From Swiss-Prot:
The species this protein was found in: Drosophila melanogaster
Keywords noted in UniProt: Developmental protein, Glycoprotein, Membrane, Transmembrane, Transmembrane helix
Gene name of the encoded protein: disp
Glycosylation-annotated residues: N127, N176, N197, N264, N319, N388, N767, N883, N891
SUPFAM superfamilies associated with the record: Multidrug efflux transporter AcrB transmembrane domain
Protein name: Protein dispatched
Taxonomic lineage of the native organism: Eukaryota, Metazoa, Ecdysozoa, Arthropoda, Hexapoda
Function as written in the Swiss-Prot or TrEMBL entry: Segment polarity protein which functions in hedgehog (Hh) signaling. Regulates the trafficking and the release of cholesterol-modified hedgehog protein from cells of the posterior compartment (P cells) and is hence required for the effective production of the Hh signal.
Length: 1218
């Protein structure tokens, strides 16, 4: 805010100095009120789906995808469009029947009135019961499957009989019932939820069931003595319900990937030692305390079902109850079976139902209990066995456990983490529990302690820098208030409904920015105090006398005066820093990706609110500190104060040596630094723009955790197993081409809300019934088949190009001699193409309906989409035009149909891929050809557009384009700020060159670290500009404001004053980012790495490259300096600059606080630069015109209340001034 250098702001300085409590309380009340309103009126952010918002909106492809989504939503059974006209007619008939029933309630005969009423009542009760127990029915089906038995017992079976291998015994002696009586408990319609019965039962029926269960259990225990020898005995007893509860592994169950470790890590898992180690490992998995609460139990006991694993299948094959009993012969037996049956599995002659449905073309031993299929498909990697090779090598094996994937497994996952699933030979390297989003949501909150730790470190740095715990506390509160205010403006004022988790990354950034502003303000405050004491001295270090009162001073040194000077410099300096950073964030709003757009707005708003608090809350807090801690100074300092002073002296000496070393290296070796950093910048540019380049992501899966996390390892290994390959291998999935007419490619939804897709907009010019349109559609379908991207598809594809099917439909005879009814089909018969519009509109719905009635027809998305039009009378039908048609009539009126949209679909010969270049070539070739075709289309069909499976490609294309746009906008904003505040074209060019090379080096380092241009990386690149430009901005401005216009002297002047604060800012922000690298989630780690890299690179380039450039070719004596009339006028008003002078100190109690007293003691020590802007002086002395102006409205009795005499002996510290 440049207005702080204006005389009109004196009232504000007066308020800060005289009424700081009022300012602090007012701001606190306002901030707390805003935060409460935001939390009460707005829902708390939901991070259950971290990838929500990672989509493109507003682009050409994005609008088409949104319109396509809205079209699909509108064509479902609840929308206004229908692919099958019969569905629309059926709904119309139902609605009319409902109306007629209400208009004529007594049309039925009275004799059936009570009968129908009772029947309707029973039907209603049955429907209600069916609805209530729909979920239970699914469980009962599985339950009955496990308890299945033959429909009637064999006559030669005894009373106690084991039927089948399902584990169900029937006790005819006790129950004395039919074969189905023993299954009576399974027919209950109880409401069962995870083993809890929530309904009431009849007492007698309950007692009977209990007796039945007891008798059944008695027989189960007796059955333990039944013979179990022989593989051919299919009726042998298995534990309760079979070895695996009569079920097979499925993807919906939790599963673990096992790998061999140890000295024999390269050996195959498929040997006796490997299987025994896996057996032990699965026991570790199932023995955690909470496992029994989540596992799928056997239906008749509380025992958990066995895990589906390779050792368990080997034990079942060997007819052993435990996998610990396996021998080498058992492993060999399984090996022989798998080798002999592999060819049938590889040739797709087996599936998961071979033991139930006799359709598998494989030998019986290969189908028995699905051992072969389950082992090869689920439990071993796809390279385990190779065709025509008797050698097997198993690198990865899978263990499935009977625990369904759910977000409720988080406690169980933590127990597995504590157990460490590993033994001497094998370990679990990956797992899939369906917990990715839930765990990420938890870690997003639990890792906040890292943010707090980083904030604590920054606040500790502020404490050491300021020496005031009060200022440190108020600075921390200011940062918290800035976040709360930003959320208020984001959610309430700007009405953003979506809050992505990436917005939380702004917390890390604002901690560093807020601390930098505190450093800046306190630095200027210290320098102002130092300059005042050095100019108003009556005591030397060799003599000591009483300090004079304020009445005896020639110039009254008021708190208001000090505040005015500090604010005039600090407010403008903080404004420049905040402007560049907020501008870089707001530039991200130009992105078409929802999450990036929201992050840019929130992060930019946080920076703005932080700036507002730093020019209101922080000055008032400093004013309170000067009042609150003003005490009488004593010459007898306690030991703690002496230690602090000694520590400060050591730090001061180190800083002095550090600054002198850097200054001498730049002044003496400027050409060497230019050569080194210039070469690094050129090399970085090659890395960024040529090789390897900033690669686009090639995985649609967005990584949430570190690469070594079990969930992320599973994402990289899952394609090693056959059951995952159909979902991940796209070699058989070809890109579909959807050509759409009748719908505008418009997205009128909220681009900042991923749940808002707007409405479907129709093309009013669309009309497919005209003769030119019919001819063009037919020619278009024929032209598509001649293109190189078209794939010839076998089978019936009737709806893909509906016009061809309609032509065949219209060729039929009007009266078929083979039809006994001899129904006249006019006008939909014996017609010549192209058809008359009214005939086309009338017959098209019939043609489509007949096609849907075909048994071999499989409905898709292609074809015309019908909507209901206003009902017309019979005599109005001949006057209908456009896309209207009619099919049936009731009460003498027609129900016309409108062809509101048209979709023509073909399959291309391009396989789906996540590689950007491949899909880009496909999209551009099809799009270019289609646009050329539309130029020859009649006007009513020129509004068509093409779309396909382009969602991920759209994100890739947007990232590559929008990131470049955001960089250009941020760089342009930075250049504008530099021109405005340096007022020198050459300095601005040098600074922009430095920032550009800093960005190149930052991005190059990130590329070498393996980063790809994904969502977070795009944000990081644009944010780096705002963070990197600050250091260059400070160096450039102070070079321009140097009191000496000669190049070498100006360079040395800047280095002696800027190095310290920039090092402090870079260190605090970089270390705060370094702390975030200890997080468990990837976004926190990446933002930490980014902050560390950008701080190091930008500081080194600003200090060594820019200052070396200014040392060698910097402007001097006003060369290429812009002349602004207003600034020239201000510059002529003052020409005094801050100079160090020997310390002769005079002070009043108002200024002798922990802050000011430290300044007194360090008056002769090294004083860094002032972050001043737009002024010809770094610190103006309060004398003459400025002093009189600042005190014009201040009553002199204001100072009298703070007057106290002090006597102290000060020690002179060595100065670092040259």
């Amino acid at each position: 805010m440049l207005c702080f250098d204006s005389e009109r702001m004196n009232w504000y300085y007066h308020v800060l100095a005289r009424r700081p409590y009022l300012v602090v309380v007012s701001i606190a009340v306002y901030c707390v009120a805003c935060i409460i309103v935001a939390l009460v009126l707005n829902k708390l952010p939901d991070f259950s789906d971290p990838t929500l918002g990672f989509e493109t909106r507003g682009t050409k492809i994005g609008e088409r995808l949104t319109a396509w989504y809205n079209l699909l939503q509108e064509t479902d059974h609840h929308g206004a469009l229908f692919s099958n006209p019969s569905d629309l007619w059926e709904r119309r008939r139902v609605e009319q029947g409902y109306v007629e029933t209400k208009l004529h309630p007594n049309h039925r005969r009275r004799k059936n009135k009570h009968k129908n009423r009772n029947k309707n009542k029973r039907r209603k009760e049955q429907n209600q019961s069916s609805h209530e127990h729909h979920d239970v029915a699914q469980k009962m089906m599985q339950f009955k499957k496990r308890l299945k038995a033959t429909s009637s017992p064999s006559p030669n079976l005894g009373f106690d009989t084991w039927i089948g291998d399902s584990g169900v015994f029937r006790d005819y002696e006790i129950t004395n019932d039919s074969a189905s009586s023993s299954l009576e408990p399974t027919r209950r319609t109880e409401q069962i939820e995870y083993g809890h019965n929530t309904t009431s039962v009849d007492e007698e029926e309950h007692q009977q069931r209990v007796q039945t269960k007891k008798s059944t259990w008695r027989l189960l225990k007796q059955a333990a003595t039944l013979p179990t020898d022989g593989w051919a005995d299919m009726h042998r007893r298995q534990p309760i319900e079979g070895f695996f509860c009569d079920s097979s592994p499925r993807k919906e169950y939790s599963h673990f990937v096992v790998q061999r470790i140890g000295p024999n890590a390269t050996d195959s898992l498929f040997d006796l030692n490997g299987l025994l180690a896996m057996c032990q490992l699965q026991d570790q998995i199932t023995e955690v305390p909470s496992y029994r609460a989540f596992c799928e139990p056997e239906m008749l006991t509380t025992e958990c079902c066995r895990p589906w694993s390779l050792p368990n299948y080997a034990a079942m094959l060997a007819n052993k109850s435990s996998c610990f009993d396996l021998t080498t012969e058992d492993v060999t037996s399984l090996h022989t079976l798998l080798l002999g049956c592999y060819e049938y599995f590889h040739d797709l002659k087996m599936d998961n139902h071979c033991n139930e449905i006799p359709h598998c073309r494989a030998p019986e031993e290969c189908k028995r209990l699905n051992i072969v299929f389950n082992v090869l498909n689920f439990l071993t990697d796809f390279s385990f066995i190779k065709s025509n090779d008797s050698n097997v090598y198993l690198k990865y094996a899978m263990i499935f456990i009977p625990v369904a994937q759910s977000n409720r497994l988080l406690p169980l996952f933590h127990e597995w983490e504590d157990v460490e699933l590993i033994n001497e030979l094998v370990e679990v390297v990956a797992m899939d529990l369906g917990l990715e989003n839930e765990l990420f949501n938890e870690l997003l909150l639990t890792d906040v302690w890292l943010v707090s730790l980083g904030g604590t470190f920054v606040m500790a740095s502020v404490w050491l820098y300021t020496g005031s715990a009060f200022i440190t506390l108020m600075s921390c509160v200011a940062i918290c208030f800035s976040l709360g205010l930003a959320y208020f403006f984001y959610a309430i004022v700007l009405e953003f409904e979506f809050f992505p988790y990436m917005n939380l990354l702004a917390v890390v950034v604002i901690i560093g920015i807020g601390a930098d502003d505190v450093f800046l303000f306190l630095k200027i405050w210290h320098c102002v105090l130092t300059e005042r004491f050095s100019n108003r001295c009556t005591l030397t270090t060799q003599s000591q006398s009483a300090l004079p009162t304020l009445e005896n001073s020639d110039h009254t040194e008021s708190l208001e005066n000090i505040m005015a000077l500090t604010m005039r410099h600090a407010a403008a300096s903080m404004f420049v820093t905040s402007l560049t950073t907020a501008g870089a964030f707001y530039a991200s709003y130009s992105s078409s990706i929802t999450a990036i757009k929201c992050f840019g707005i929130f992060a930019g708003t946080v920076v703005v609110t932080n700036y507002l608090l730093m020019i209101t809350w922080l000055p008032a807090s400093v004013s309170i500190m000067e009042r609150l801690f003003a005490t009488r100074m004593s010459c007898h300092h306690p030991m703690s104060i002496k230690l602090i002073h000694a520590c400060k002296k050591s730090i001061n000496r180190f800083c002095q040596m550090f600054e002198e070393c850097i200054t001498k290296s730049i002044m003496n070796y400027a050409y060497l630094w230019l050569l080194i950093f210039g070469a690094l910048g050129a090399s970085s540019a090659v890395i960024v723009f040529w090789y390897p380049g900033l690669q686009l992501p090639e995985k649609s899966h967005f990584q949430l955790f570190v690469s070594k996390h079990p969930f992320e390892v599973y994402s990289s290994l899952k394609q090693q197993f056959w059951f995952e390959k159909p979902l991940q291998a796209y070699e058989n999935f070809k890109m579909h081409m959807h050509f759409v007419w009748g719908v505008q490619a418009v997205d009128d939804g909220d681009y900042t809300n991923p749940n808002s897709y707007g409405h479907l907009h129709y093309d009013n010019n669309f009309n497919v019934s005209s003769r030119p349109a019919q001819l063009w559609i037919l020619d278009f379908c024929q032209s598509v088949r001649q293109q190189p991207f078209y794939k010839e598809t076998l089978g019936m594809l009737l709806p893909n190009c509906f016009i061809e099917n309609l032509i065949d439909y219209m060729k039929r005879r009007c009266i078929d001699d083979m039809d006994s009814t001899r129904k006249d089909r006019s006008p939909c018969c014996d017609a010549q193409f192209p058809f008359e519009p009214h005939i086309f509109e009338y017959c098209l719905p019939q043609s489509i309906s007949n096609m849907y009635d075909t048994t071999f027809f499989r409905p898709g998305v292609a074809g015309p989409k019908f909507a209901e039009a206003p009902r017309l009378e019979t005599e109005d039908y001949l006057g209908m035009s456009g896309n209207e048609s009619a099919e049936y009539s009731t009460n003498g009126s027609f129900t016309p149909l409108l062809v509101k949209a048209l979709v023509i679909e073909f399959e291309s010969n391009v396989a789906y891929s996540t590689i950007y270049a491949n899909i880009r070539q496909f999209y551009e070739s099809v799009e270019h050809w289609f646009q050329m075709q539309l130029k020859t289309a009649p006007p009513e069909l020129q509004g068509g557009w093409f779309t396909s499976d382009l969602k991920f490609y759209n994100v890739q294309d947007t990232l590559s384009h929008d990131t470049f746009v955001a960089i250009c906008l941020a760089m342009a904003a930075s250049l504008a700020v530099l021109l405005c505040f340096t007022v020198n074209i050459l300095i601005s060019i040098y600074a922009v060159l430095t920032v550009s090379l800093s960005i190149f080096n930052t991005v190059a380092v990130l590329i070498l670290l393996g980063w790809q241009l994904n969502i977070l990386e795009s944000i990081a690149v644009s944010t780096a500009i705002g963070l990197a430009v600050d250091f260059s901005l400070h160096y450039g401005i102070h070079y321009r404001m140097s009191p000496v216009k000669e190049r070498l002297a100006a360079t040395q002047f800047v280095l002696s004053r800027i190095i310290g604060p920039t090092v402090m800012a870079a260190t605090t922000t970089g270390l705060a980012g370094g702390i975030m690298m200890a997080s468990n989630i990837l976004p926190y780690i990446q933002i930490g790495v980014f902050l560390v890299v950008v701080m190091i690179v930008s500081w080194f380039y600003a200090t060594f490259f820019l200052m070396s450039l200014l040392r060698v070719a910097g402007p001097q004596h006003g060369f290429l300096e812009l002349k602004w009339p207003l600034w020239s006028k201000r510059s002529s008003g003052s020409s005094k600059f801050y100079e160090r002078k020997p310390s002769q100190v005079i002070a009043s109690e108002q200024l002798l606080t922990p802050t000011s007293s430290a300044i007194v003691e360090l008056a002769n020590s090294e004083t860094h630069e002032l972050e001043s802007l737009n002024s010809n002086s770094l610190i103006k002395t309060i004398s003459g015109i400025e002093s009189a102006h600042a005190l014009s409205s201040l009553p002199r009795d204001f100072e009298h209340s703070f007057q106290t005499m002090h006597e102290c002996k000060y020690q002179t510290y060595p100065s670092t001034s040259n």
